[in-house]
């Protein structure tokens, strides 16, 4: 039931682009004492946090696997363009909820028409057009592709914050495009966290 609630919440929020409390300028950094093994040493870019509605974000430092973009098209049941520049991409674990949903975080040099959230440095979208532009060498300079999302029910993330599982960090200190594997250790060892 919890996952059905989260799916419906995320589906309608994304469809309506109605993030009333967009906090894309914040990252959550798991503390070394994080009790949930799924979130050990994770860095999450926050999409939304509202005590009454819950929270959502994307884990940005957990690569799952590297593959050719043609493999990604095939595994996503998408028809690739006829002429494809087959380059390697890395798929990241975005979180434990809705693993079949794909998200893209890309640099601001590329414009998405249908985006979930955006700031001056990067944009988050589910628009598949970005893949077609990447294979045509018309995509963003920087991007990451994520499977799944991290989502919390109302009050759940607040409890985890009170329990001291997470630290907040502004995006002045990192970018989603920094080295994923080393991002957590660099952030957790910085003085201001």
Residue ranges with predicted function:
Residues 19-146, 150-193:
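A short aromatic-anchored loop/beta-hairpin motif
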Residues 1-3, 140:
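Short hydrophobic/aromatic segments of transmembrane alpha-helices and their interfaces
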Residues 3-13:
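Sec-dependent N-terminal signal peptides
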